[in-house]
Swiss-Prot record:
GO terms for cellular component: cytoplasm; cytosol; Gemini of Cajal bodies; nucleolus; nucleus; SMN complex; SMN-Sm protein complex; spliceosomal complex. Its main location: nucleus. Monomer. Part of the core SMN complex that contains SMN1, GEMIN2/SIP1, DDX20/GEMIN3, GEMIN4, GEMIN5, GEMIN6, GEMIN7, GEMIN8 and STRAP/UNRIP. Part of the SMN-Sm complex that contains SMN1, GEMIN2/SIP1, DDX20/GEMIN3, GEMIN4, GEMIN5, GEMIN6, GEMIN7, GEMIN8, STRAP/UNRIP and the Sm proteins SNRPB, SNRPD1, SNRPD2, SNRPD3, SNRPE, SNRPF and SNRPG. Interacts with GEMIN5; the interaction is direct. Interacts (via C-terminus) with SMN1; the interaction is direct. Interacts with SNRPD1; the interaction is direct. Interacts with SNRPD2; the interaction is direct. This is Gem-associated protein 2. It comes from the Eukaryota. The SMN complex catalyzes the assembly of small nuclear ribonucleoproteins (snRNPs), the building blocks of the spliceosome, and thereby plays an important role in the splicing of cellular pre-mRNAs. Most spliceosomal snRNPs contain a common set of Sm proteins SNRPB, SNRPD1, SNRPD2, SNRPD3, SNRPE, SNRPF and SNRPG that assemble in a heptameric protein ring on the Sm site of the small nuclear RNA to form the core snRNP (Sm core). Belongs to the gemin-2 family. One of its GO terms (biological process) is spliceosomal snRNP assembly.
Length: 269
């Protein structure tokens, strides 16, 4: 069996793309100066390639990677429901069936509702306006007061600028998928540091109803984040009869069972 030089073995794995004819450059060839002819250039490339190691291992400092990491993806599931808080399987199945009907209706009548004229006081923010959407959905009063909720003082009329606009079909039908995903992210960020409110619940339900399948990766991550946060807040609710419990259960149910995130589903009570 003939001996095969190491360079030939490498060339079998990395074949030449351009043929290079052998040339005699022994006279006057100086590899330290810029090449003057095509032959000198190709010869210089061959010399530099021969000096490179066959295998290069990058020395990576894990501490630097960890320090510069900007996105944290949690694969953990939802917090288990406290005793007596988890909904029955029948209830979850009923909610999924009703939600499916709502989504079909929204899709069917989207063009109709989109054509309806909005009231003069409805000014929808641009997709990238996070603060604008928070105020639009939750109201300037709630955004200013944090998680304390809107004032219950009676007023002669509803000031939607202060209390937030509800997710009317004439509003959500005007939102494309980019805006829906963005608003879902904005409200999820808000919810991540605050308590659950009816305003949040209504908007989360409407946004999920308008979210198209198959989900984009960003939307997939956001709805899982939403379900996990709902389970965390549910742990802090002092009574199973609290009105927040069925609303939180509903959002967890829709994310896990309608959008097929089964690892987040509640175990039936």
């Amino acid at each position: 069996m003939a001996w095969v030089p190491a360079e030939s073995a490498v060339e079998e794995l990395m074949p030449r793309l351009l043929p290079v004819e052998p040339c005699d450059l022994t006279e006057g060839f100086d590899p330290s100066v810029p090449p003057r002819t095509p032959q000198e250039y190709l010869r210089r490339v061959q010399i530099e390639a021969a000096q490179c190691p066959d295998v290069v291992v990058a020395q990576i400092d894990p501490k630097k990677l960890k320090r510069k990491q900007s996105v944290n993806i949690s694969l953990s599931g939802c917090q288990p429901a406290p005793e007596g808080y988890s909904p029955t399987l029948q209830w979850q199945q009923q909610q999924v069936a009703h939600f499916s009907t709502v989504r079909q209706s929204v899709h069917k009548h989207r063009n109709h509702w989109k054509s309806q004229q909005l009231d003069s006081n409805v000014a929808m923010p641009k997709s990238e306006d996070e603060e604008g959407w928070k105020k639009f959905c939750l109201g300037e009063r709630l955004c200013a007061e944090g998680a304390t909720g809107p004032s219950t003082e009676e007023s002669p009329g509803i000031d939607y600028v202060q209390v937030g606009f509800p997710p009317l079909l004439s509003i959500v039908s005007r939102m494309n998928q980019t805006t829906i995903t963005s608003v879902l992210e904005y409200l999820s960020n808000w919810f991540g540091e605050r308590d659950f409110t009816p305003e949040l619940g209504r908007w989360f339900y409407a946004l999920l109803a308008c979210l198209e399948k198959p989900l984009l990766p960003e939307a997939h991550s956001l709805i899982r984040q939403l379900a996990r946060r709902c389970s965390e807040v549910r742990l802090l609710v002092g009574s199973k009869d609290d009105e927040r419990v069925p609303a939180l259960n509903l959002l967890i149910c829709l994310v896990s069972r309608y959008f097929d995130q089964r690892d987040l589903a509640d175990e039936p009570s």
